[in-house]
A protein has these predicted regions:
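Large, well-folded core regions of big proteins
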Residues: 355-361, 367-368, 374-376, 395, ...
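Short loop/turn motifs that connect adjacent beta-strands in outer-membrane beta-barrel proteins
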Residues: 187-194, 235-242, 278, 369, ...
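Bacterial N-terminal signal peptides
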Residues: 4-15
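Alpha-helix capping and helix-loop boundary segments enriched in small/acidic/polar residues
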Residues: 257-259, 270, 302, 351, ...
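Structural preference for beta-rich elements and adjacent junctions enriched in aromatics
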Residues: 17-398, 406
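Extended, hydrophobic alpha-helical segments in both membrane/secreted and soluble proteins
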Residues: 247, 265-271, 279, 285, ...
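Exposed, low-structure sequence patches enriched in small/polar residues
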Residues: 356, 441-719
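Outer-membrane beta-barrel transmembrane domain signature of Gram-negative proteins
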Residues: 215-240, 379-431, 549-602, 613, ...
Length: 719
């Protein structure tokens, strides 16, 4: 407890010690304004800036480094122009590069990794609320990545896909690009003249340089539009009805599944309707997720359930509408203990097996100062189990520019023997400074034939240039139950804290920053009369400008087990009090290199014995079109009761025939289960947001062999 308090006091006391940007940076940012020029004839989007209309627009330039030399002028010049007509916003950019033949293009697939190679990104804050934004990113190969940034870049929805076009061209003095973004792809105020927040980001990978048009401090994302400039000059723009219908048909052969017919064909419909310029309705009928990639296997040496991330597109869209708390976008302790909304509870069994979804509705967006999220989904009956109806609702209101509050409800209703589970709660967020946020939320559960319970969290988050801190408290009653959340264990209270000090070299250096930090957490029962877990540790890191990094850590753990738990195939750790130490080191190489990889080694005491874990990964980029990667992991556990070894193997091949046609293969082996899993996906984008998928899934284990070949065709109709 004393150590946790010391971390909090130290971090808060040093908040004001963080270096402020130079005084002239605010003046530069205030002057960052560019006008879009109206044209009457659409341009030809081919990546070559040879249309006469481009001469009508005044170019804007002068990008400022975010990395490595914060706020210095970028070493590569970038010029950007803006045009528009009745239907489209056009963006043309010339990115000068002294050796364009050495540009780095790592991938061509949709939603490529944006910062691991050369690239350009356009950030639009269309409501000019200085909090939320659209992002449109490309690379010299013309790949597309689009996303939504929320809460000043702290949350990012890379699964949002809009209709837009980009083409690029590499030339002797650099590379150029042209965007065409339909106004109906965007949401913006219904007013005669538009003024949007604007920023642009460029990655010049060989120079290890990230720069933005309007200067952004290096500790923040380029989606932090509190630091954006202004795009003006757009008049009489209309977002249109923004009605999208996407019918789909599926078919396939499934051999070896006890609950699925050998051959099956089906169809369904997805709908998206922009009710207002800021509020959208999504509907889905006969929802299908057959094209979703398989979960990555994990080694579990703990007594808790594993956490698998959501991969289904429908649930990944508009995540900020249902996210509660400041830590939901990270791997913090508080997130592992209590996640207020976990969409994998819908349409998936406890073992990750699909449960058919009849359909659902989702309403998300803004109405005045309110942010609204409403979703309802219905699953089918499975054998003797009736289907469930799930409801998720959250309404947030900005009380002031720095204070917001929300109320939320999550529920499951069924006609079976377990008829309902309902959770209601509220949340408060404060942002007293750009780098400091405070949260608090509480919720109460009601379950049929069971007593109700409480759960909640308070926390503080500091993201300074030199000082970073997380601290707070999590409480979960023993009687609390949440069928739409992730609760690692009940009947606990956890204090957690983490402080990191970043040290940045002065003058030229290959190192971006060094970090040293400490963390402490203490968990007791919910009455705080019995200590359950205490973990304290130190962390060290060296982060290089070329994206390579070295990390090391050491932890000391106290555990008070009131009952035994299984570990490995046949062993068990008996009840009792345990104290043990462990440590580890990890390295990741330059991610933009043709050959990259890394490793992690950890080990030490483990309950009554010892354990050691080694993980290695390697990625080989043959070209912008083809890349292969491999991951190997082995954990060896030695206990007085016996020993065991757990192995994981992952092999991946990504082949992008073009920015609109891809082949992905993912093969995994889980040694603990003696199971091979294969997933091969072919994806052709035959028109914007319209896909053809061919998917092969295979599972082989001593008790099960299952093979499935699936076909899915989607066709977007936009009005």
């Amino acid at each position: 407890m004393r150590l946790a308090s010391a971390f909090v006091v130290l971090a808060v006391a040093t908040t004001h010690a963080a270096a402020a940007p130079p005084a002239d940076i605010d003046a530069i940012r205030a002057a960052k304004r560019v006008d879009a020029v109206r044209i009457t004839t659409p341009i030809v989007v081919d990546g070559v800036l040879d249309d006469e209309a481009w001469a009508l627009a005044e170019p804007t330039s002068d990008f400022y480094q975010q990395q490595p030399a914060e706020f210095e002028l970028a070493t590569r010049r970038t010029e950007v122009r803006f045009l528009y007509d009745d239907e489209m916003l056009y963006v043309g950019a010339m990115l000068y590069e002294p050796e364009p033949e050495r540009l780095i293009t790592n991938e061509l697939k949709r939603d490529f990794g944006g910062s691991s190679g050369d690239g350009f990104g356009l950030i639009l804050d269309t409501f000019h609320d200085r909090r939320n934004a659209y992002g449109f990113i490309t690379n010299p190969g013309g790949a597309q990545r689009d996303s939504l940034g929320y809460e000043n870049g702290r949350r990012n929805d890379a699964n949002w896909h809009g209709v837009w076009t980009v083409r690029t061209s590499v030339r002797g003095d650099g590379w150029s690009l042209e965007y065409a973004i339909p106004f109906k792809t965007l949401r913006f105020p219904d007013s005669a003249a538009q003024e949007w927040g604007l920023n642009m980001v460029r990655w010049a990978r060989r120079a290890n340089e990230t720069s933005t048009w309007s200067p952004v401090p290096r500790q923040f994302s380029h989606y932090n539009v509190a630091y954006a400039g202004m795009l003006s000059g757009i008049a009489q723009a209309q977002p249109g009805r923004n009605l999208q219908l996407k019918p789909f048909v599926t078919g396939g052969v499934d051999r070896g599944s006890p609950n699925t017919p050998d051959r099956d064909a089906d169809g369904g419909l997805d709908l998206k309707w922009g009710i207002t310029s800021s509020l959208a309705l999504d509907a889905t009928w006969r929802t299908d997720f057959s094209q979703v990639e398989a979960d990555e296997q994990q080694i579990n040496l703990t007594r808790f359930s594993l956490f698998f991330p959501e991969k289904r597109e429908f649930f990944l869209e508009s995540p900020a509408a249902f996210q509660i708390g400041l830590l939901e976008d990270s791997n913090e302790t508080a997130r592992r203990e209590l996640l207020p909304f976990f969409s994998r509870r819908i349409g998936l069994s406890a073992r990750g097996q699909p449960i058919p979804v009849v359909g659902g509705l989702r309403l998300t967006g803004r109405a005045g100062r309110q942010t609204i999220g409403l979703m309802t989904m219905r699953t089918e009956d499975v054998e003797e189990r009736p289907g469930d109806t799930f409801v998720a609702t959250r309404v947030a209101r900005e009380l002031t520019s720095t204070v917001s509050a929300s109320g939320f409800y999550f529920g499951r209703e069924s006609s079976g023997t377990d008829p309902f589970n309902r959770v209601i709660g509220s949340e408060l967020r404060l942002r007293p400074a750009r780098t400091l946020e405070v949260e608090a939320f509480a919720m109460h559960s009601s379950t049929a034939n069971q007593a109700g319970g409480w759960a909640g969290r308070t926390g503080v988050r500091l993201d300074g240039a030199r000082h970073r801190m997380r601290a707070g408290y999590v409480h979960v009653d023993d009687a609390f139950r949440h069928d739409l959340g992730f609760v690692r264990r009940r009947g606990i209270g956890t204090l957690f804290s983490r402080y990191t000090r970043a040290i940045r070299p002065t003058g030229p250096s290959r190192v971006k920053e060094y970090t040293i930090g400490g963390q402490y957490e203490a968990t007791a029962n919910d009455r705080w009369d019995r200590s359950l877990t205490r973990v304290g540790g130190l962390t060290f890191g060296t982060f290089f400008n070329n994206t390579a990094e070295v990390r090391a850590w050491a932890n000391s753990t106290y555990e008070n087990l009131d009952e035994s738990f299984p570990v490995g195939p046949v062993l068990a750790v008996p009840a009792g009090v345990y104290r043990y130490e462990d440590a580890g080191v990890a390295f990741d190489s330059n991610k933009s290199a043709a050959l990259s990889g890394g490793f992690e080694l950890s080990g030490g005491e483990f309950w009554t014995g010892r354990q050691r874990t080694a993980t290695a990964n390697m990625r080989l980029r043959f070209s912008a079109n083809v890349a292969a990667s491999a991951t190997l992991a082995r954990s060896v556990v030695d206990l007085p009761e016996g020993s065991f070894t757990a192995d994981l193997i992952g092999l991946r091949l990504d082949w992008s025939f073009s920015p609109r046609m891809f082949l992905n293969s993912f093969v995994q082996y889980n040694g603990e289960l003696d199971t091979w899993l294969s997933n091969v996906r072919y994806n052709l984008i035959h028109r914007p947001l319209s896909d053809i998928y061919v998917v092969w899934n295979e599972t082989r284990s001593p008790t099960l062999t299952r093979r499935a070949l699936l076909l899915k065709y989607t066709h977007l109709l936009a009005f």
